[in-house]
């Protein structure tokens, strides 16, 4: 073997060894505040949060890692990495890329985002809240029914009898003859102590910087303090189901799918009262300039809520937040 051939063989081995070492070299991700190793798991989880299927999220994460290693990159900033991720998502679906940008903006914020989703029984507040939380990467989702249970433990039934009824039967426990619609009067009396608990959750979230979504029938605009409704980081929505027959059908579907302790018949027995509360909440929301969304299709409702929040964040981002870097 000639000296020239030997040199060529050594060079090829060196290149292969260098490439092999590059494949196993750790990539560091840096921001102004921290440095950490690149993690496919962390990246994949951030992608699933915006709706990418888990297997696809890991494929994208692996591909990005391999490309960085092939280019011999040992250090990359979070912003540079985010640009690469967005480009990959744009190749798949522009909507996913937009969701990723929104998710990043929310994660950057030091000030929390609080979403309140109201609506009468059966309009789908819990389903929509869960989907919005998944889309925005907000894991804290609280139902007002849970807050009501806490308030029941704090406030005696003798003092607040309507609190111990359902929102649509509270009128039965009124201690006086109401001048107006007893169903609405009872509902408001029932909701007042729950709203105190809702305001407590919102104030704590603001003070501690915790993103949260609160959903349920007790989100009554006229009962919530104006400073909370007007707080720039609080987003309030009211859900409706305009078609009464569609609203009725939802109780049957929910009872069948979730094995509720209360069968559909109980809700349908008081359907007239539920619809009166439904219409009252819609009117109250409109009077307070709160978006009312006809919840016919889950995806469309979620898109409307997320788009509204996104546009508001973009409009007031400079005034509302100080950014730190996240993936």
Curated annotation (Swiss-Prot):
Pathway given in the UniProt record: Thermoadapter biosynthesis; cyclic 2,3-diphosphoglycerate biosynthesis; cyclic 2,3-diphosphoglycerate from 2-phospho-D-glycerate: step 1/2
Region (Disordered): 1-27
Gene3D superfamilies xrefs: P-loop containing nucleotide triphosphate hydrolases (3.40.50.300)
Residue intervals of the ATP-cone domain: 25-111
Stretches with biased composition (Basic and acidic residues): 1-20
Catalytic activity as recorded in UniProt: (2R)-2-phosphoglycerate + ATP = (2R)-2,3-bisphosphoglycerate + ADP + H(+)
EC number(s) given by UniProt: 2.7.2.16
Gene Ontology MF terms: ATP binding; kinase activity; phosphotransferase activity, carboxyl group as acceptor
Cofactor names: a divalent metal cation
Top-level enzyme category: transferase
InterPro entries with a match to the protein in the record: 2PKG, ATP-cone_dom, P-loop_NTPase
Pfam families for this protein: ATP-cone (PF03477)
Keywords annotated in UniProt: ATP-binding, Kinase, Nucleotide-binding, Transferase
Matches recorded under PANTHER family: P-LOOP NTPASE DOMAIN-CONTAINING PROTEIN LPA1 HOMOLOG 1 (PTHR33477:SF3)
Family to which this protein belongs: Belongs to the 2-phosphoglycerate kinase family.
Job description of the protein: Catalyzes the phosphorylation of 2-phosphoglycerate to 2,3-diphosphoglycerate. Involved in the biosynthesis of cyclic 2,3-bisphosphoglycerate, a thermoprotectant.
Name this protein carries in UniProt: 2-phosphoglycerate kinase
Gene: pgk2
């Amino acid at each position: 073997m000639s000296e020239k051939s030997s040199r060529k063989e050594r060079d090829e081995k060196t290149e292969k060894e260098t490439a092999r070492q590059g494949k196993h070299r750790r990539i560091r991700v840096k921001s102004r505040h921290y440095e950490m190793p690149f993690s496919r798991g962390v990246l994949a989880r951030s992608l699933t949060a915006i709706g990418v299927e888990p297997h696809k999220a890991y494929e994208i994460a692996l591909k990005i890692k391999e490309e960085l290693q092939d280019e011999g990159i040992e250090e990359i900033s979070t912003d540079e990495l985010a640009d690469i991720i967005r480009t990959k998502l744009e190749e798949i679906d522009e909507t996913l890329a937009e969701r990723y940008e929104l998710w990043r903006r929310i994660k950057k914020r030091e000030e929390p985002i609080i979403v309140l989703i109201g609506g009468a029984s059966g309009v789908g507040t819990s389903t929509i809240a869960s989907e919005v939380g998944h889309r925005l990467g907000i894991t804290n989702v609280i139902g007002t029914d849970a807050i009501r249970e806490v308030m029941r433990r704090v406030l005696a039934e003798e003092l607040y009898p309507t609190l111990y009824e359902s929102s649509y039967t509270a009128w039965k426990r009124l201690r006086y003859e109401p001048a107006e619609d007893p169903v609405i009067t009872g509902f408001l009396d029932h909701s007042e102590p729950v709203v105190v608990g809702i305001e407590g959750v919102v104030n704590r979230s603001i003070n501690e910087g915790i993103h949260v979504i609160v959903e349920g029938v007790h989100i009554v605009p006229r009962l919530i303090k104006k400073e909370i409704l007007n707080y720039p980081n609080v987003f309030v929505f009211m859900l409706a189901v305009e078609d009464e027959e569609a609203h009725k059908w939802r109780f049957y579907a929910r009872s069948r799918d979730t094995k509720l302790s209360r069968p559909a018949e109980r809700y349908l027995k008081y359907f007239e009262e539920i619809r009166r509360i439904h219409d009252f909440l819609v009117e109250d929301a409109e009077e307070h300039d709160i978006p009312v969304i006809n919840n016919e299709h889950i995806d469309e409702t979620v898109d409307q809520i997320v788009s509204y929040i996104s546009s508001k964040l973009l409009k007031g981002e400079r005034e509302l937040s100080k950014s730190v870097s996240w993936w």
